[in-house]
Amino acid sequence: MEQAKAVAKQVRIAPRKVRLVIDLIRGKQVGEAIAILKHTPKAASPVVEKLLNSAIANAEHNYEMEPNNLVISEAYVNEGVTLKRFRPRAQGRASRINKRTSHITLVVTEKKEG
């Protein structure tokens, strides 16, 4: 079965926060998923929505799939590189702040007939 995918790497949002959004759309039809993302007040929502639109465009252009029949078959988030930063603290000390990044992957396939 044909599948189209889109990957966003080094997204500056923690994987734990992106997973909350990804879990909402996994297994859904793309139209329904876009509607869910538009009404989800999370920072990761616009990023995931843009990625989903990219996956739909890939399916349409590269594999000639029908956009109305697409379903999100796989959606997962992996941890990217962690940027280490320092925050000044009292008494001349410093604490390390981890700025986490994510690699987001969406795979869409055509819904089976019947």
UniProtKB/Swiss-Prot annotation:
The keyword Transcription regulation does not apply. Transmembrane segments: none annotated. SUPFAM superfamilies: Ribosomal protein L22. Gene3D superfamilies: Ribosomal protein L22/L17. The keyword RNA-binding applies. InterPro entries: Ribosomal_uL22 (IPR001063), Ribosomal_uL22_bac/chlpt-type (IPR005727), Ribosomal_uL22_bac/org-type (IPR047867), Ribosomal_uL22_CS (IPR018260), Ribosomal_uL22_sf (IPR036394). GO terms for molecular function: rRNA binding; structural constituent of ribosome. GO terms for biological process: translation. GO terms for cellular component: cytosolic large ribosomal subunit. Pfam families: Ribosomal_L22. Keywords: Ribonucleoprotein, Ribosomal protein, RNA-binding, rRNA-binding. HAMAP family: Ribosomal_uL22_B. Part of the 50S ribosomal subunit. Belongs to the universal ribosomal protein uL22 family. This protein binds specifically to 23S rRNA; its binding is stimulated by other ribosomal proteins, e.g. L4, L17, and L20. It is important during the early stages of 50S assembly. It makes multiple contacts with different domains of the 23S rRNA in the assembled 50S subunit and ribosome. This is Large ribosomal subunit protein uL22. It comes from Shouchella clausii (strain KSM-K16) (Alkalihalobacillus clausii). The gene is rplV.
